[in-house]
């Protein structure tokens, strides 16, 4: 029972993390390639987030989880050498975001991701999911949040 519960929890986490990505076009995902060791990129991401005053509230090692559960879901290979996400928020920006439209809670937390594929070792892809909204007030604050996320990714890629 404990094993089944752990698998269900892992599946729900993956579904909640990656299914929204599948629902958006690739043009709404901003990525940059970094030719660097994954561990160096990881440290750069964590520093770039912290240097802007954000606090990571969850760090997910998605690649490890996918490898650990591969046989359980009928997979025989690995997509990633490493794949991780960092989730964080800003009380100031998030407050502005939900005050203009309460549904904008869907955009919190912010997520930066990094992965290195088995097929392209030595290149780490760093990025974030760009935000979009229907109303102008939401677009304005979401654009400000995207600017912060883009600056994190660009700093890591330098």
Language-model features and meaning:
Residues 52, 82-84, 108-110, 122-124:
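Envelope-exposed proteins and targeting segments
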Residues 115-122:
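A short, structured loop/turn motif at beta-sheet edges
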Residues 34-42, 59, 76-79, 134-142, ...:
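Solvent-exposed, acidic/flexible segments
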Residues 1-10:
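Bacterial N-terminal signal peptides that target proteins for export
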Residues 126-158:
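C-terminal partner/receptor-binding element of secreted or periplasmic proteins
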Residues 23-63:
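Terminal, regulation- and interaction-focused segments at domain boundaries
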Residues 61-66, 70-107:
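Compact, glycine-rich, soluble single-domain proteins
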Residues 18-20:
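N-terminal signal peptide c-region/cleavage motif recognized by signal peptidases
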């Amino acid at each position: 029972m404990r094993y089944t519960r752990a698998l269900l929890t892992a599946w729900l986490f993956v579904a909640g993390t990656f299914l929204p990505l599948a629902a958006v076009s690739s043009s709404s995902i901003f990525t940059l390639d970094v030719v660097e060791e994954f561990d160096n990129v990881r440290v750069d991401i964590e520093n770039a987030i912290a240097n802007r005053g954000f606090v990571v509230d969850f760090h997910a090692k998605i690649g490890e989880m996918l490898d650990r559960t591969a046989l359980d879901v009928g997979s025989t290979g690995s997509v990633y050498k490493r794949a991780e996400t960092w989730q964080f928020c800003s009380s100031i920006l998030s407050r502005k975001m939900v005050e203009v439209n309460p549904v904008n809670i869907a955009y919190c937390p912010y997520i930066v991701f990094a992965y290195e594929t088995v097929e392209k070792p030595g290149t780490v892809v760093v990025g974030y999911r760009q935000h979009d909204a229907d109303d102008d007030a939401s677009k304005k604050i979401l654009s400000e949040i995207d600017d912060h996320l883009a600056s994190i990714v660009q700093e890591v890629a330098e």
